Amino acid sequence: NDNHVEGKILRLRQQYFLSAASIGDIVQNHLSSYATLENLPDKVAIQLNDTHPTLAIPEMMRILLDECGFDWDKAFSICQKVFSYTNHTVMAEALEKWNVDIFKMTLPRIYQIVVEMDRRAREELAKAFPGDQGKIDYMALIGDNQVRMANICAYTANSINGVSKLHSEIIKESVFHDYYLFKPNAFKNVTNGIAYRRWLLASNPGLCKLLDETIGDGYKHDASDLTKLNKYADDKTVLKKLNEIKLANKKDFASYLAKSTGQVIDPNSIFDCQVKRMHEYKRQH
């Protein structure tokens, strides 16, 4: 619960911990293979899914500046090429912001980097929108005693997308309209979906075998081929095989759960699952 100062500090520390751990791992793995970060943009792409991992940007800057000796321009150029941002919020008032005092106290070095990012951003924006101080203040990374996570992402990222065609148009016309004017080529649409090569090809070999037998293996390279399965919607033989695959997968999961946690569940029951953080606003209580 972050309705009080202690909760806000804890959440900010959690966000930094997860971001810093991820960036540290990426950098370490890259250096073990290439011994330099000069080519990081050629080998690594980091997608920021909403603003919660925004601290990955100043943390990457910290590593490049403090630990690797890059100058600011080179370090920021690497970040611009590496980071992309997916927006999930169309209301400006709902965008994530952090009180400057909390941010500065909790993450002093990261705050210093964000302050310098803000200073340079304001200089660049002043050249793009001369005399329009209102626009510059709205797009700034720090303002009204708040660190604006979405603006850090929008200013840095090489790609900014919504999660549906309509959503992507809305953010261009409203919440990020000024950034759209500033860097229009960065705005794209990526409709929400799953990485089916992971959640189907790698995770569900039984279903893949059935698909191979019914529609061929073209779907492995072109997901639109999956629509060919529609013609089997009333095929009792195919539906029977599908149910057998589902049951086998449920038995596998039940076995794994029993071995790893000691919990025993009936694979013939309905599995109603939620993978979400535990929080009162999720109505889990």
Feature roles, as predicted:
Residues N1-H285:
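A conserved ligand/cofactor-binding region detector
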